[in-house]
Amino acid sequence: MAKANTRKTRRKKERKNIEHGCAHIKSTFNNSIVTITDAVGNALSWSSAGALGFKGSRKSTPFAAQMAAETAATAAMEHGLKSIEVYVKGPGAGREAAIRSLQAAGLEITLIKDVTPIPHNGCRPPKRRRV
């Protein structure tokens, strides 16, 4: 018997009207991920260098982080976002570029905080590369 054509109807994203939110920038050696949330932590928008089509070593560049932050900021500003607190995590190259890009997109930055986790001598790090 033939399967009935069942189409899933996708809901249209509603505008949330949020004035103040948080931007979480995770910048690793391989990629940069920017997530913009409301004050509670519910995600409004996100973007990453890999999601924008950057592949391989180009994902870890400051330009890729800048583009990711710009894309996430424009999507969040459609929800009425005007000001953000920025939380930066990781040692990557795109940290400062992403922050500057958020400011250039028209968002007012009220706080910049480094939340990189620092071990109190926890796990053993990977061995040094000998190239």
Curated annotation (Swiss-Prot):
Disulfide bond entries: none
Keyword check for Disulfide bond: no
Source domain of life: Bacteria
Gene Ontology molecular functions: rRNA binding; structural constituent of ribosome
UniProt xrefs under PROSITE patterns: RIBOSOMAL_S11
GO BP of this protein: translation
Keywords: Ribonucleoprotein, Ribosomal protein, RNA-binding, rRNA-binding
GO cellular component terms, A-Z: ribonucleoprotein complex; ribosome
Subunit annotation: Part of the 30S ribosomal subunit. Interacts with proteins S7 and S18. Binds to IF-3.
Function noted in UniProt: Located on the platform of the 30S subunit, it bridges several disparate RNA helices of the 16S rRNA. Forms part of the Shine-Dalgarno cleft in the 70S ribosome.
UniProt record similarity statement: Belongs to the universal ribosomal protein uS11 family.
Protein name: Small ribosomal subunit protein uS11
Natural source organism: Clostridium novyi (strain NT)
